[in-house]
Amino acid sequence: MKIIFVFALLAIAACSATAQFDVLGQNIRQYQVQSPLLLQQQVLSPYNEFVRQQYSIAASTFLQSAAFQLRNNQVLQQLRLVAQQSHYQDINVVQAIAHQLHLQQFGNLYIDRNLAQAQALLAFNLPSTYGIYPWSYSAPDSITTLGGVLY
């Protein structure tokens, strides 16, 4: 009798676990199908809910208005542009360093050796920060600087 009870309990637990796993799988698939705009709205929804709770009906109608949604989308677009501009600014720094090193090598300019090593190391590490290696290039494990020190 105890064995039958144990098997029945195991069967119930297995059915429950299977049902929970199916619900989890459906939630994951639903998350993968959603559009980026909908995901952005879901990220902001806790903040919207907080404002609704704090400022009652007036805030709720404002948050649902088309003007708010338009402004919200504009802010998100501006944030994406800021990230892109930061990325391009770092690339411009690398170009300036490369130009300075070129002038040092061919323009007979004197530049501090330690500064040149630090700039070379910065220029070396920047592509790995943004993952902008060409297809045929892989990142080396170390770099030898002018002083022969391995980093």
UniProtKB/Swiss-Prot annotation:
Transmembrane segments: none
Localization per Swiss-Prot or TrEMBL: Vacuole, Aleurone grain
Keywords from the named record: Pyrrolidone carboxylic acid, Seed storage protein, Signal, Storage protein, Vacuole
MF terms (GO), sorted A to Z: nutrient reservoir activity
One Pfam family matching this protein: Gliadin
Signal sequence segment: 1-19
Residues recorded with modification Pyrrolidone carboxylic acid: 20
GO cellular component term, pick one: aleurone grain
Primary role: Seed storage protein; serves as a source of nitrogen, carbon and sulfur for the young developing seedling.
Family designation: Belongs to the prolamin family.
PANTHER family per UniProt: PROLAMIN PPROL 14P
Listed name of the protein: Prolamin PPROL 14P
Organism: Oryza sativa subsp. japonica
The organism's taxonomic lineage, starting at the top: Eukaryota, Viridiplantae, Streptophyta, Embryophyta, Tracheophyta
Gene: PROLM20
